[in-house]
Swiss-Prot record:
Site (Cleavage): A65, N66
Protein family (similarity comment): Belongs to the pneumoviruses glycoprotein G family.
Protein name from the UniProt record: Major surface glycoprotein G
Disulphides: C173-C186, C176-C182
Gene this chain is encoded by: G
Keyword DNA repair: no
Source species, domain of life: Viruses
C-alpha cells in the first residue's frame, strides 16, 4: 500500500511541474504580445497552483512518515509477543524438576522444602550451601569496609583548586590590554613579591642611620667646650683696665676707701677688752695710712 501511495504522489508532482512549465511559457508569450493584464492573471494563477502543490506535497510526506512510525511500533510489539510466547512454551515443555534445580542457587526457600523430603545427605548439602551464602555475605561486608577508606581520601582533593589558582596568578600584564580584572591580577603578583625583600633591607638601613647620627654630634660637643672657655677670658678685661687712664684708677681707690671706713666702724662697735678687738685695729691702721698716702700721691 505504501508503494502505491508513493507512486501516486510522484505522478501528481510531475503533473504539477508540467502545468507550471506550460503556464510560464504562456506568460512569456503574453508579455511579448504586450498583453500585460492577461499575463498578470496567469502569474497569479501560477502562484496559487504552486502554493497548493507545496501544501499537498507536505501533507503527503507527513502522512507517509506517520505510517512508517506506526509500522515500527507494530514490529516491536510483534517481536515482544513472539518472545513471550516462546518463553511460555519453553516453560510448559520443561519439567518442574529442572526449573526447581535452576532456581536453587538463587533462592534459599526451595532448599528448605527439599530438605524435608530428602535424606540426611541432602541436609548436609543444604548446610554447606547456607554456609557458603553466609561466607559470601561476610565477604561482602568485608569488602564494604575498605570502601570507607577512599572516602577519607576525597577531601584532600581540594588543594587542586588552589594549585590552579596559583597557576592563574602567573599572568603577564602584557596580555591584559584594557581588561581591568586582568590588571588587578597583575598588580597582586608584584605586590606579593617585594614584601619578602624589605625584611632584608631594614637590617642594613639602621647601620647607615647610626653613622649619620654620630657625625653631627661631634661638632655639638666642641661648641659646648667653647662656651665653657669664654668665661675664663672675662677676667682678662680687668687686667687691661689697669693699664687704662688714671680716671679709672681713682674710681678704684674710692671703692677701697669705702671698704676701709666700713671696717673701722665695725671695729669701733666691738668692745676694747677682748683680745681680738685690740688686734684688729693694728691690722686696719696700716691699711688706712696706706690709703691716705695713696690719695696724697694722686693729688
Amino acid at each position: 500500500m505504501s508503494k502505491h501511495k508513493n507512486q501516486r504522489t510522484a505522478r501528481t508532482l510531475e503533473k504539477t511541474w508540467d502545468t507550471l512549465n506550460h503556464l510560464i511559457v504562456i506568460s512569456s508569450c503574453l508579455y511579448r504580445l504586450n498583453l500585460k493584464s492577461i499575463a498578470q492573471i496567469a502569474l497569479s494563477v501560477l502562484a496559487m497552483i504552486i502554493s497548493t502543490s507545496l501544501i499537498i506535497a507536505a501533507i503527503i510526506f507527513i502522512i507517509s512518515a506517520n505510517h512508517k512510525v506506526t509500522l515500527t511500533t507494530v514490529t516491536v510489539q510483534t517481536i515482544k509477543n513472539h518472545t513471550e510466547k516462546n518463553i511460555t512454551t519453553y516453560l510448559t515443555q520443561v519439567p518442574p524438576e529442572r526449573v526447581s534445580s535452576s532456581k536453587q542457587p538463587t533462592t534459599t526457600s526451595p532448599i528448605h522444602t527439599n530438605s524435608a523430603t530428602t535424606s540426611p545427605n541432602t541436609k548436609s548439602e543444604t548446610h554447606h550451601t547456607t554456609a557458603q551464602t553466609k561466607g559470601r555475605t561476610t565477604t561482602s561486608t568485608q569488602t564494604n569496609k575498605p570502601s570507607t577508606k577512599p572516602r577519607l581520601k576525597n577531601p584532600p582533593k581540594k588543594p587542586k583548586d588552589d594549585y590552579h589558582f596559583e597557576v592563574f596568578n602567573f599572568v603577564p600584564c602584557s596580555i591584559c590590554g584594557n581588561n581591568q580584572l586582568c590588571k588587578s591580577i597583575c598588580k597582586t603578583i608584584p605586590s606579593n613579591k617585594p614584601k619578602k625583600k624589605p625584611t632584608i633591607k631594614p637590617t642594613n638601613k639602621p647601620t647607615t642611620k647610626t653613622t649619620n647620627k654620630r657625625d653631627p654630634k661631634t661638632p655639638a660637643k666642641t661648641t659646648k667646650k667653647e662656651t665653657t672657655t669664654n668665661p675664663t677670658k672675662k677676667p682678662t678685661l680687668t687686667t687691661t683696665e689697669r693699664d687704662t687712664s688714671t680716671s679709672q684708677s681713682t674710681v678704684l681707690d674710692t671703692t677701697t676707701l669705702e671698704h676701709t671706713i666700713q671696717q673701722q666702724s665695725l671695729h669701733s662697735t666691738t668692745p676694747e677688752n677682748t683680745p681680738n678687738s685690740t688686734q684688729t685695729p693694728t691690722a686696719s691702721e696700716p691699711s688706712t695710712s696706706n690709703s691716705t698716702q695713696n690719695t696724697q700721691s694722686h693729688a
